[in-house]
């Protein structure tokens, strides 16, 4: 199953292995412009942009999309996608603690490991 990436970030190797496809070219630029809000948006702007993003996804003939970003936008985007028969998914990651020895010093970092997707139910 192909999952179209509708986030502003490139899919990770783990996500690609699970079927995520990144947008490219003009479609990527259009999507990023629609997802970038400068200043406080009106409800009308939020809904118009959600509609446009959903229309972009529909043009790619996919059943599922990976979404994520500004919380105030996600609800409108979920509904716009579902009205077009497209299933919105959120990536789910687990934080993994990793210890590395660098110059005889143990450095502990957190990395995020992609586990799967959470389907939106309305």
Question: What are the language-model segments listed below?
Answer:
Residues 68:
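Conserved residues at the C-terminal ends of beta-strands
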Residues 1-64, 76, 83-122:
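Long, low-complexity, Lys/Arg-enriched
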